[in-house]
């Protein structure tokens, strides 16, 4: 019985840890000196899927961007802190920060 418990615990713990993960997405437009940011959201999908959805939303809106990143934090507070740092750095660099109300589907 003990080996089964250990196996179940090994499977459950990473699942619990990932349930607390949060992301936000950002997409810089270097030529236009802009950066597009999403609000933080629970990381319920892969990074690739989140980046693809964010890029698709920007493209449909006609926004020009160079690439998309959706960094992960170990919780909502960590993601908010990372996002705020990105905002501060980009403002210091003279970039316009554009906060979007986007949320991923899924």
Feature locations, PLM:
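Sec/Tat signal peptide C-region and signal peptidase I cleavage site
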Residues: 13-19
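Short Trp-Ser/Thr-centered turn/loop motifs at beta-strand boundaries
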Residues: 20-22, 26-47
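Compositionally biased P/S/T/G-rich terminal and signal peptide-adjacent segments
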Residues: 42-62
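Surface-exposed, polar helix/loop patches in the mature regions of secreted/periplasmic/lumenal proteins
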Residues: 73-106
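Sec-dependent N-terminal signal peptides
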Residues: 4-13
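A short, exposed loop/beta-hairpin motif centered on an aromatic-Gly-Thr core
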Residues: 36-44, 63-78
């Amino acid at each position: 019985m003990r080996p089964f418990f250990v196996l179940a615990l090994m499977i459950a713990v990473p699942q619990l840890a990932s349930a607390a993960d949060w992301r936000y997405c950002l997409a810089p437009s270097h030529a236009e000196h802009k950066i597009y940011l999403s609000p933080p959201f629970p990381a319920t999908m892969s990074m690739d899927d989140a980046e693809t959805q964010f890029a698709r939303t920007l493209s449909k809106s006609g926004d020009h961007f160079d690439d998309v990143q959706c960094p992960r934090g170990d919780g909502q507070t960590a993601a908010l802190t990372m996002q705020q740092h990105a905002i501060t750095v980009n403002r210091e660099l003279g970039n316009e920060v554009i906060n979007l109300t986007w949320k991923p589907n899924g």
